Amino acid sequence: MFNGMVRTIRDSVVGTYPSCHVSSRLEERRAKQRAMRQERRRKPDKPDDFVTYEDSGSDEETPQQQEEVLNTSYNLCDYLRSRESGLRDRRSVNVEYTSRYVLTHDMLRETQISLGYINKVFCSKWLSSRQVVFGTKCNKLLVYDVNMRRVDAIPTLSNSRANHPEVQGGLHAIELSPSRSFLATGARNSSDIAVYRLPTLDPVCVGEGGHRDLIMGMCWLDDQFLVSGSKDSRMALWRINEDHMEFPDGGEEACPTFATIHPLSVKEVRTAQRIRSLCFNKEFKEIAALSLNGYIHIFNAETFKQTLSRKLPNCQDNVSIAYHSDGLYAVGCRSYTILLDARTLQTIKKITSRYSGCGIRATSFEGNLLTVGTGLGMLLFYDIRAGKYLESSVNASRTVALKCSKGIVYPEDEMDGFQQVKYVPAIYTHCYDSTRMRLFAAGGPLPATLVGNYAGVWQ
């Protein structure tokens, strides 16, 4: 059933064979090969114009090849056990096929994460197969270990400006550099950027002087250049190069130190009112920015100059933008998701939500699958090639949707007012791990006045 989806070459333990080491598999393999050869040798009614021939001497497999065949498992459970146990087996996975299979066959189960008194998770990224990092409205940078089920706090970085009023609005963006060498997010002052080294999460630098209001979006252009967008309607270009940074002396205790940097360039985004989200179009070498007044703005990534702005059609409460390599932008707004042609910014399709009052809070592309986080505590999946929501293989009458748990609202007395309307959290962020078989989703109460959180791993 899973042949072609996952492949695990298991190492034999002394004195034992893996469970997949069954001698009859060799005979079954030979029988299939013989049947395929006979089918190819069958003379068609009409002669072929182009014929290929195989070397008959290549039919026999060496003992080493036969041993590898017997040690190879195509079972999904063997793959998952090997991955979660950290075994040295050679593993491969067809991520496009696998992610669709586990979604359409209702195989994902939620593990809710207890965060305590934390207010709203706004951004997240997987660091590895076992660690996911996320930022909150209360300016916490947290790392969750999936295996240990433990949450650790990473210290936020403060700037060098004494007696300078700080902007406190939370961490709204986390981005990893293309080589996964650096992590960029907001600093303790929400109008500054903070960069950490991966995988250790040691501090590298704080970027100050680029913005006057909290940073809402970021995107890496390459391993050195980072762009940030803020509610002050500005975009800033930063260079992250440790060879050009000055690090203070850590003193006798050798405390971790970090540099202070300033932007290479700061641009006021014309016709914009509050930058909400950014993404980088690698194919066209352009930066797309989304503003809360319903415009999409395009910057040339090589010159860092604004080239155009376009008003989005009937777009309210637009908060997220994602780019697909086929030349598509996806913009999430109050009642639907818009697909735009990246060349012309013309609307290709409006994807209406399957549920009424379902505001779009987060969007992302993984392959040809558009994942949408909603204000009703659900994740929806849209196949851009098929032009429809992903359909369940278990129940053909419904589409695939992951319905998240309620999470927590503080104080708990506040929950009483939501019992009649069946309170659910808004999903502000989601991200897949490298195999796309595990999905982190998080958020919190939709009303700004409420304090609470939700976080969970679907696996």
Swiss-Prot record:
It comes from the Eukaryota. The gene is DCAF12. In larvae, expressed in neurons, glia and muscles. Keywords: Cell projection, Cytoplasm, Nucleus, Repeat, Synapse, Ubl conjugation pathway, WD repeat. Substrate-recognition component of a DCX (DDB1-CUL4-X-box) protein ligase complex. It is found in: Cytoplasm; Nucleus; Presynapse. Pathway: Protein modification; protein ubiquitination. Its main location: cytoplasm. It holds the Pfam family Beta-prop_DCAF12. Disruption phenotype: Embryonic lethality. WD repeats lie at residues 166-206, 210-248, 270-309. It comes from Drosophila melanogaster. Belongs to the WD repeat DCAF12 family. This is DDB1- and CUL4-associated factor 12 homolog. GO terms for cellular component: cell projection; Cul4-RING E3 ubiquitin ligase complex; cytoplasm; nucleus; presynapse. Disulfide bonds: none annotated. Residues 25-67 are annotated as: Disordered. SMART domains: WD40. One of its GO terms (biological process) is protein polyubiquitination. One of its GO terms (molecular function) is ubiquitin-like ligase-substrate adaptor activity.
